[in-house]
């Protein structure tokens, strides 16, 4: 069959093609609901599927969904009711043993990604006409003047006017259309496992334990419902390489020997294996657009460098991408000039805070005395409130 010329090429099958059905992709699809656009959402996995993560769902993520549609937030709570723990407090322990408890006013919860992501995708099924293609890994992505073309591992190519890359830290879309070298100074690695029978852990409290030997990181203990705990340890990749750290070994050692954790884990049972994951940190200059493409969430390196969470940034950036997708499709303009406002919008909404959090993280990691000073200051309520605002 002869190759079609550009003039004779058929129009793209879809208006918007979203790669990745996690929080960023699902939020983008939800925000495109009712737009009249032909939207397809593809993912390499079949849901429900596990995703290695800390499982914390911060309040800004829930606020963003509620602003989009209050019904979404209410239904999400109902769908995750059997697999979540509402959080009221974060308990932080310094390397020297000081402790601070921060009580949160806005709703937040912990929920295994196996269930949370599945619930978000269920909202997409209920409330939009999005075509959802699961079990659809992609081999290649290319952009031309007229369309973007995604080649699945099996089946026919998918074409669209605009591509939204929401396919995570190891994004195929970003790697092929907006390649960026790994910068270990702006990347964290972590391991996590699930445990049962963990002692002295209030159901509404998440624990963060900072270590003297590994300052650009922390150990966490998060209840996720049903007596299950997400337990992990992560740190800056630059320090991992320099110190030759084995994260799994450190996690086991900390749980066995740390004075705050060892008594609580003496009778604990690990469920399944320890798994690792990477976290591309926000606050840098990584591109958020590529030819006919917008990047969201972890694919755009939007993880909070100070706190390590990324679901809120993923959902917010997915919604912003949908807003700009509507504009581009309405104007039939997918030029770099038309896509640039998306990057500027993400920078205004998220980038400035992420940049501040990155430099705070670096400062605290290199100045141990400052960490202890912050814990001391946090004993006083006015200073504690100021620190909470500073850290977002």
Regions found by a protein language model. Name each.
Residues 123-264:
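Predominantly flavin-linked oxidoreductase catalytic cores and closely associated redox partners
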Residues 62-119:
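A conserved beta-strand/loop capping segment in the N-terminal third of enzymes
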Residues 8-24:
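Beta1/beta-strand and adjacent pyrophosphate-binding region of the FAD-binding site
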Residues 18, 22-23, 47-48, 115:
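Residue-level detector of alpha-helix initiation sites
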Residues 33-53:
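Glycine-rich FAD pyrophosphate-binding loop
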Residues 140, 157, 239-321, 328:
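FAD/FMN-dependent oxidoreductases across multiple families
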Residues 323-392:
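C-terminal helical "tail/cap" subdomain of flavin- and related membrane-associated enzymes
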Residues 20-25, 168, 297:
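Conserved phosphate-binding and hydrolysis motifs of nucleotide-dependent enzymes
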């Amino acid at each position: 069959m002869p190759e079609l010329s550009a003039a004779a090429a058929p129009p793209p099958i879809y208006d918007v093609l979203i790669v990745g059905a996690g929080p960023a992709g699902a939020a983008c699809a939800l925000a495109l609901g009712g737009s009249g656009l032909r939207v397809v959402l593809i993912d390499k996995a079949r849901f429900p599927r596990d995703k290695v993560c800390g499982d914390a769902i911060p309040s800004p993520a829930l606020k963003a969904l509620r602003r989009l549609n209050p019904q979404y937030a209410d239904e999400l709570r109902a769908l995750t009711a059997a697999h979540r723990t509402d959080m009221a407090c974060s308990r932080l322990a310094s390397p020297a043993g000081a402790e601070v408890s921060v009580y949160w006013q806005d709703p937040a919860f912990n929920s295994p990604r196996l269930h949370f992501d599945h619930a978000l995708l269920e909202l997409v099924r209920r409330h939009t006409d999005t075509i959802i293609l699961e079990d659809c890994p992609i081999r290649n992505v290319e952009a031309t003047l007229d369309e973007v073309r995604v080649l699945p591992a099996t089946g026919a190519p998918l074409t669209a006017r605009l591509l939204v890359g929401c396919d995570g830290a190891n994004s195929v879309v970003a790697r092929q259309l907006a390649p960026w070298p790994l910068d270990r100074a702006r990347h964290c690695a972590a391991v996590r496992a699930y445990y049962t029978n963990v002692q002295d852990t209030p159901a509404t409290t998440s624990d963060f334990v900072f270590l003297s030997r590994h300052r650009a990181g922390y150990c966490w203990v998060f209840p996720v419902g049903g007596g299950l705990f997400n337990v992990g340890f992560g740190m800056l990749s630059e320090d991992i390489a320099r110190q030759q750290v084995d994260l799994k070994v450190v996690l086991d050692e900390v749980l066995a020997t740390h004075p705050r954790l060892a008594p609580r884990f003496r009778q604990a049972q690990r469920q399944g294996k320890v798994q690792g994951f990477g976290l591309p940190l926000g606050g840098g200059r990584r591109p958020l657009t590529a030819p006919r493409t917008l990047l969201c969430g972890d694919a755009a390196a939007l993880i909070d460098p100070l706190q390590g969470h990324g679901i809120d940034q993923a959902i917010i950036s997915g919604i912003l991408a949908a807003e700009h997708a509507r504009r581009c499709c309405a104007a039939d303009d997918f030029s770099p000039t038309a896509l640039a406002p998306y990057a500027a919008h993400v920078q205004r909404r998220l980038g400035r805070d992420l940049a501040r959090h990155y430099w705070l993280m670096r400062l605290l990691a290199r100045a141990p005395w400052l960490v202890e000073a912050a814990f001391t200051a946090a004993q006083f309520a006015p200073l504690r409130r100021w620190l909470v605002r500073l850290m977002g």
